[in-house]
A protein has these predicted regions:
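Phosphate/NTP-binding elements of NTP-utilizing enzymes
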Residues: 2-162
Length: 162
C-alpha cells in the first residue's frame, strides 16, 4: 500500500499580515515526527510517515511564523474521523512540543473529557518515547502521574481531565 505523500505544499490562506512560511521550521517539525514510530495496529514499529493531509497540518502549524519569529498558530482545532490515527498524530505533536521545540520548561497539556480518554494519547506518546533510543535516554516517564519530562529542558507533557 502506497502512502499519499504531500507533493507540493501550499501554505494556508489563513495567515496574518506579515507572517511567512519558514521551510526550515516546517521541515524540522516533519522530520521530528517522522523519526518516531507508530505504536499500534498494522503500522506498529514502523516509522511515522505523514500522509498528505497530516503533513499539511504540521507544515501550517509549525512553519508559518509571524514577523517576530513566533509561530502564528498556538491553538488548532482539528476534526479527524475514527480510525485515522488521531492518537498517534496527537502524541507525536505533544512530543514535538515537549522535546523538539527547544523551549526551557515548556508545559504541554493533553486534555479530554475524562482521565481515561486523555490517557490514551499519553500511553501512545510514552510508547513512542520507549521506541526511540534518542528520546528514551533523555525522557523520564512518570506513568502514575501521566507525565512525560524531557530532562534537557525540564519541559513536560501532562494529562488533564475535565
Amino acid at each position: 500500500m502506497t502512502m499519499r505523500k504531500l507533493k507540493k505544499y501550499k501554505p494556508t490562506k489563513f495567515r496574518v499580515r506579515g507572517s511567512k512560511y519558514n521551510k526550515d521550521a516546517a521541515d524540522f517539525a516533519v522530520a521530528f515526527i517522522e523519526s518516531l514510530c507508530h505504536t499500534k495496529g498494522t503500522w506498529a514499529g514502523k516509522k511515522f510517515e505523514l500522509i498528505d493531509w497530516q503533513e499539511q497540518i504540521i507544515r501550517d502549524l509549525f512553519g508559518i511564523l509571524k514577523s517576530n519569529g513566533y509561530r502564528q498558530f498556538n491553538t488548532a482545532y482539528i476534526e479527524i474521523p475514527k480510525k485515522q490515527g488521531k492518537s498517534e498524530l496527537a502524541a507525536a505533536v505533544a512530543l514535538l512540543l515537549t522535546c523538539g521545540d527547544g523551549e526551557e520548561r515548556a508545559e504541554v497539556y493533553g486534555c479530554a473529557a475524562d482521565r481515561q480518554q486523555a490517557s490514551i494519547v499519553f500511553e501512545v506518546a510514552a510508547d513512542m518515547v520507549r521506541m526511540c533510543p534518542a528520546l528514551n535516554k533523555r525522557v523520564k516517564i512518570l506513568a502514575s502521574q501521566k507525565r512525560i519530562i524531557y530532562l534537557p529542558t525540564n519541559s513536560f507533557y501532562q494529562v488533564l481531565s475535565a
